[in-house]
């Protein structure tokens, strides 16, 4: 089973769309977009995604991609 990376549509509009597009090219990830992930406070402050239900944050799309892969490696999800 591949790691699931979940994005909130509101956070995508705030800049994490670029990270989502990069991650969607990885066949070893399941990337999903939802209308809301119920992290509104976090969503307004920073870019984030949930990786297998755990929040990963960053200040820009490139850092978000890097942090997601780091989280996956550290937790041996692939």
Swiss-Prot record:
Transmembrane domains' residue ranges: none
Top-level division of the source organism's lineage: Bacteria
HAMAP family according to UniProt: UPF0349 (MF_01542)
Family: Belongs to the UPF0349 family.
Name of protein: UPF0349 protein BLi03401/BL03152
Protein source organism: Bacillus licheniformis (strain ATCC 14580 / DSM 13 / JCM 2505 / CCUG 7422 / NBRC 12200 / NCIMB 9375 / NCTC 10341 / NRRL NRS-1264 / Gibson 46)
């Amino acid at each position: 089973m591949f790691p699931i990376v979940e994005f909130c549509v509101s956070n995508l509009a705030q800049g994490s769309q670029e990270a989502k597009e990069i991650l969607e090219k990885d066949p070893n990830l399941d990337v999903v977009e939802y209308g809301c992930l119920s992290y509104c406070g976090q969503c307004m402050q920073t870019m984030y995604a949930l990786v297998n239900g755990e929040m990963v944050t960053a200040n820009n799309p490139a850092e978000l991609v890097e942090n997601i892969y780091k989280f996956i490696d550290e937790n041996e999800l692939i």
